[in-house]
């Protein structure tokens, strides 16, 4: 992170000004060339080195950026310029933390900046330090209450020192911190204000615009307002196209997959995540873990549990791995382990981190109801309901209805459970949450079966199964098939615990995408040609072929085509 840089000690240098103008235009290569020449021509000019470091950062040339910034820092220190030295120390903290993932080194530079600023009057650099304090508390400790206090200080200092850019980002972080505490409407109002100011031209540094939009998207994700999140992702993509910064593009791609996962658009989600992982492995290996965790969650939902586990091992240390591991335990019919992981996660999350606690509470209540721990489940359901009532978005209200319904079912109050779960389905559908809606339908079907209403239970189960198979949600689809078997055999009402998983899944119809692939195979196209025709990766086509052949119980492409023709699939 950085703020506008003061004028050079020798502004008459034409080459330096050419580099400065190139930075403003986003002409990164020209900026690097001009600023390198300026630094070589005037090696004692700290501003030239500082600007060169900025240009290298835009081009993701981290080592060169750090080298240039360290040179600038030394020159500013030599001339006794504590304010500029502190600014560059903050820029070095950014490089080490964001690009290299070296938190300890980054903290060293933050503390150096803090000491340099201690005796100086309030400035934009002081405001930027408070922004960093807020960011580090949110990222490292997950404590939105403390983060809000830092952000509010940053807003106040920026206003006094007329540091408009950093003040807008501080305002966005204050809003994000409020959302994290469950004060969603208050926080989103601040985020709307910050975003409007950024789009209205009050932000001159493109990085501030980008980070302000990221705060908005993160807040939307926390309250599960993914329609709003998608709108901001599209705006952020336009920004990335304008400024041609690969790191921003990749980060935007990952944020976008949150909405795709929620909406059940998993083919596109998979392509975006695989591309993001490849880009991060190449350009910023230290930042790849977040994308790996999200890909692990997708693989889990697809029923590829072993692959999900492998990805989580690779992403070890990322704070979100515990949540996916708990879900994996549920997929493997191990609610005791799921509950243990979820409880540990909740112990680590502060009470103030209300929206961050929701996912762990959902897992915990589902696990406890499977274990028949009704009183414990009521406690978790009560906390989640309190959060949902405070945040008051449709998706969180639906999550509250689900845990209340599961708890009612575990207490054998099946009519109450059915009503709560049916209301959840409607809310999820209104929020375009295809996967969550289908999963809740299965819960409705279990309640109907427990009430002896087998015909309605069959209808709900078949609808859920169709939706899950269309998405490629194999883990939940297999649960639906097992439930369908039990309802059809008349044993579902007496079986409250999940049935033991069989090694061989029940064969179901092909998804829409699998039928498209099979039709192109019938035309004689290769996987590479199919990928080009459908705008997919070749790897994704391979996966579709493997899945459809497994579903059709055949071992060759020709046999798949023959069966597809026979069964009217193509």
Give residue ranges: language-model regions.
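Single-residue signature of alpha-solenoid repeat helices
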Residues: 31, 65, 105-106, 147, ...
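Tandem amphipathic alpha-helical repeat scaffolds
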Residues: 18-24, 47-60, 86-102, 125-143, ...
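Amphipathic alpha-helical segments of tetratricopeptide repeats
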Residues: 32-40, 73-81, 94, 111-118, ...
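Residue signature of alpha-solenoid helical repeat architecture, marking inter-repeat boundaries
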Residues: 9, 43, 79, 83, ...
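Alpha-helical segment of the N-proximal tetratricopeptide repeat
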Residues: 11-37
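Residues within the DNA-recognition helix of helix-turn-helix
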Residues: 272, 460, 544-547
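Helix-turn-helix DNA-binding segment
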Residues: 410, 419, 443, 485, ...
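Linker/hinge segments immediately adjacent to helix-turn-helix/homeobox DNA-binding domains
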Residues: 394, 406, 420, 449-512, ...
